[in-house]
Regions:
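Helix-turn-helix/homeodomain-like alpha-helical modules used for DNA recognition
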Residues: 78-104
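Residues within the DNA-recognition helix of helix-turn-helix
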Residues: 52-55
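Short amphipathic alpha helix immediately N-terminal
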Residues: 19-31
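Basic, low-complexity segments
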Residues: 1-9
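Short amphipathic alpha-helical boundary/capping segments
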Residues: 9-17
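Short Lys/Arg-enriched helix C-cap and helix-to-coil transition segments
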Residues: 61-74
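Hydrophobic positions on the alpha-helical face of helix-turn-helix-like DNA-binding modules
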Residues: 38-39, 49
């Protein structure tokens, strides 16, 4: 998973992670710190840093698999984009699709 995907998932589900997992992900992905640098700052081993990051990533992926908030948000944005570009009848159809997505 790339940095953008992790950051996106963290923006949706970061509050569901432990504070330590969230902090480790922020330091590694947002602040671009190495495992060694994070280990020195936090006062844990590099292996513990790696474990914490891996667990955080795993939990973020599990949350998205179960809740699908990111996927649904992308679909809603696509429908809204379509609404902005079309005539009235098509706009009505897109609005209907949007309502259905929001009710899922």
């Amino acid at each position: 998973m790339d940095r953008f995907e992790i950051s996106t998932l963290r923006s949706y589900y970061g509050a569901l992670l432990t504070q330590r997992q969230n902090d480790l992900l922020v330091m590694h992905y947002d602040e671009d710190l190495s495992f060694g640098e994070i280990a020195n700052i936090v006062g844990i081993s590099r292996q513990a840093v790696l474990d914490g990051i891996n667990k955080g990533e795993k939990h973020l992926c599990e949350y998205e698999q179960k809740l699908r908030l990111v996927e649904k948000d992308k679909k809603m944005h696509a429908v809204v984009d379509s609404l902005e570009k079309v005539d009235n009848q098509t706009a009505k159809n897109c609005a209907q699709q949007l309502r259905l997505l929001m009710e899922e």
